[in-house]
Amino acid sequence: MWRLRLLVLAVLAAGSAEAQANSSDGFLEFSVGKFTYFVLSKSSPQEAVLRHISSNVTFLLFQIHSQYQNTTVSFTKTLLPSTSGTGNDRGLVFILRPEQAVCTWYLETGDTKPVQSVALTLSYSERDPIPGGCNLEFDLDIDPNLYLDYNFFETTIKFAPANIGYARATEPPPCDVSTSRESRWRLRYDVYQYFLPEGDLTEASLLHHLQRMAQVAQVKASAIKVATLTADDKTAVSFSSLPGQGVIYNVIVWDPSLNTSAAYVPVHTYACSFESVDGNCASPGRVSTKVFSTLFALLGLFVCFFGHRFWKTDLFFVGFIFLGFFFYILITRLTPLQYDVRLALTAVAGSFGGLLLVASWWRFGILTLCMLCVGLVLGFLVSSGTFFTPLGNLNVFHDDGVFWVTFSCIALLVPVIFMGCLRILNILACGVVGSYSVVLAVNSYMFTSLSYITLNVLRRALNTDFRGAFIRVPFQTNDYIILAVWGMLAVSGITLQIRRERGQPPFPPHPYKLWKQERERRVTNILDPSHHIPPLRERLYGRVARIKELFQKEQPAGERTPLLL
């Protein structure tokens, strides 16, 4: 029994040694299909060697990954643009010569800090397509890499077209001589997306999940296919950016004639910087955003439970959203102001919009106009939620005209449906929109996918290129919890207000008419004590006189004792 235990321990030790790799004297030895963890430093570059390559292998794909520090992989010790690649996720394709059984790569980093890395070597036969084999855009002759670029709005990946496979010691098939079924134009490209756990920014987690996105079978089993491209399509795909959320992308090139596939080098992003001071990956929300969203959520929470009873507060909330949304879009598209300045101006404009809607109700009392604004705000949220579903990724909605017309029709449909029961419309808007403001506030402190229900619409209004982006977000444990909280707040607020308003007038009376009637009553009714109240000017003069008396010295009153006792 003890011999069996020793044997098991020896096997485990051997496996661990293979996984970590022997890096003594700057030398790493790899095995095909096995991930190797190692630490790369500026002072000690590494030499990676793969031995005992099978004779039926035509080309090798070597790749190295790190979290955010750059690494370099090269065919030669002297770095050249055509024989090396530098980045977080980089790889090289090596076309084997006849009888070649050993292959060598050189690894290094220019970062002053040690870089925890993971590397992998994959082998392919002559029937497999070659990722990046028809590269005409990037530096490498054969470039299997995905080039990723992101901003606040979208994340874009680009890659070089592949070529069909060929045997050792033969010339590669021409890339652009013909478009027949015997050329690379028959190839198809499947784009995959994989989400890391929400809120997990650890290096170990990333390197672990990258193993699920490197080989064809694992990519198909773990990730979600977002799009399929043909050789006629542009080799670039855009996605909505998710700051603070880790995402891994990869492309599988498929040869339908031979039914063979090969994977490009996976690439990852968090759509944020690990090294910036404000708005970094650990805390993606700015301080100004946190203050704004927190105050907005407090107002929304009050409206959620008491909006219909405090009708003017409800109107202020709706007017704030209505004018603030359009004002932010306007100043963002027309001015180069900084984000914090734009947010402050939006708060001022939103407050003005809220006061304007309250003033219009006080003076004119047009209930239909006020409820149209309330219904449009609720309709905006309903329409945004509709396009948050897979419906929003349909190709027809990549056209701005079709999208905005459909979006507006859905938003207008809500007030039209509820025009016969305005009180129910207002209570629904208070409960749903007011509780959603809490979701937006949560997003400034921790990532939640639910905030992108409205943020994606805002991005589309701000950036014309966003129309072509695929809108996909993770839905994990945090999102289920926040969705439950949102639903609980909305249902509680709606139920409470419906029960409280039972038997009450649907809406308060026109304030200006009440004020006018009260003024006429005081003028005509001399028995009313308020009739004898002095005019406002006299009351102000009287108060000023009383205040002045407080600062005057007491005057002497003459003799204070009687002369005669």
UniProtKB/Swiss-Prot annotation:
Compartments, as annotated in UniProt: Cell membrane
Matching Pfam families: TM7S3_TM198 (PF13886)
InterPro entries (UniProt xref): TM7S3/TM198-like_dom, TM7SF3
GO term, biological process aspect, one: cellular response to unfolded protein
Leader peptide range in chain numbering: 1-21
Gene Ontology CC, one term: plasma membrane
Protein topology in the membrane: Multi-pass membrane protein
Keywords, comma-separated and alphabetical: Cell membrane, Glycoprotein, Membrane, Signal, Stress response, Transmembrane, Transmembrane helix
Principal location listed in the UniProt entry: membrane
Glycosylation site positions: 22, 56, 70, 259
Parts of the chain that traverse the membrane: 287-307, 315-335, 341-361, 364-384, 402-422, 427-447, 478-498
PANTHER family named among the record's database cross-references: TRANSMEMBRANE 7 SUPERFAMILY MEMBER 3
Purpose of the protein: Involved in the inhibition of cytokine-induced death of pancreatic beta cells. Involved in the promotion of insulin secretion from pancreatic beta cells. Is a downstream transcriptional target of p53/TP53, and acts as a pro-survival homeostatic factor that attenuates the development of cellular stress. Maintains protein homeostasis and promotes cell survival through attenuation of endoplasmic reticulum (ER) stress and the subsequent induction of unfolded protein response (UPR).
The protein, known as: Transmembrane 7 superfamily member 3
Species: Mus musculus (Mouse)
Gene: Tm7sf3
